[in-house]
């Protein structure tokens, strides 16, 4: 690929990456609000679960969220820059050491819990208070 084509492709990707999502990592519990089209109307559906993996590849970035629904594990892969994602909210910061949490697939009940990262939660709380004070 020539240098000109690479710069054109990079400019196109930069234009497509427009929306900023909150920072989240593996182990964090997130709520992903997804736009669902049913017939001629559109609604927003919440999908809450634990982020078990992320793939950072520019415009092709994605993340995988796992939740337990009616006793069964359900995983969904979301494209980070997709138009169907309305918003992402981080509910809880998890403290994990692994990059991919695929081992959670084999665990059930209390064994599948993830410890909360209290230091990150305290920093987020301080940031919210500082923002409220500035207003």
Swiss-Prot record:
<dbReference type="GO" id="GO:0006412">
    <property type="term" value="P:translation"/>
</dbReference>
<dbReference type="GO" id="GO:0003735">
    <property type="term" value="F:structural constituent of ribosome"/>
</dbReference>
<comment type="similarity">
    <text>Belongs to the bacterial ribosomal protein bL19 family.</text>
</comment>
<dbReference type="Pfam" id="PF01245">
    <property type="entry name" value="Ribosomal_L19"/>
</dbReference>
<dbReference type="InterPro" id="IPR008991">
    <property type="entry name" value="Translation_prot_SH3-like_sf"/>
</dbReference>
<keyword id="KW-0687">Ribonucleoprotein</keyword>
<comment type="function">
    <text>This protein is located at the 30S-50S ribosomal subunit interface and may play a role in the structure and function of the aminoacyl-tRNA binding site.</text>
</comment>
<dbReference type="GO" id="GO:0022625">
    <property type="term" value="C:cytosolic large ribosomal subunit"/>
</dbReference>
<keyword id="KW-0689">Ribosomal protein</keyword>
<dbReference type="InterPro" id="IPR038657">
    <property type="entry name" value="Ribosomal_bL19_sf"/>
</dbReference>
<dbReference type="InterPro" id="IPR018257">
    <property type="entry name" value="Ribosomal_bL19_CS"/>
</dbReference>
<dbReference type="InterPro" id="IPR001857">
    <property type="entry name" value="Ribosomal_bL19"/>
</dbReference>
<protein>
    <recommendedName>
        <fullName>Large ribosomal subunit protein bL19</fullName>
    </recommendedName>
</protein>
């Amino acid at each position: 690929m020539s240098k000109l084509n690479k710069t054109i492709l990079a400019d196109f990707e930069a234009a497509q990456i427009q929306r900023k999502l909150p920072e989240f990592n593996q182990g964090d519990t997130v709520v992903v609000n997804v736009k669902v089209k049913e017939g001629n109307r559109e609604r927003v559906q919440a999908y809450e679960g634990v982020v078990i993996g992320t793939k950072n590849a520019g415009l092709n970035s994605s993340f995988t969220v796992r939740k337990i629904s009616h006793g069964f594990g359900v995983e969904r892969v979301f494209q980070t820059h997709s138009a169907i994602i309305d918003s992402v909210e981080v509910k809880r910061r998890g403290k994990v050491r692994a990059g991919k949490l695929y081992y959670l697939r084999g665990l059930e009940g209390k064994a599948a819990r993830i410890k909360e990262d209290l230091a990150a939660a305290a920093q987020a709380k301080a940031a919210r208070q500082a923002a409220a004070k500035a207003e």
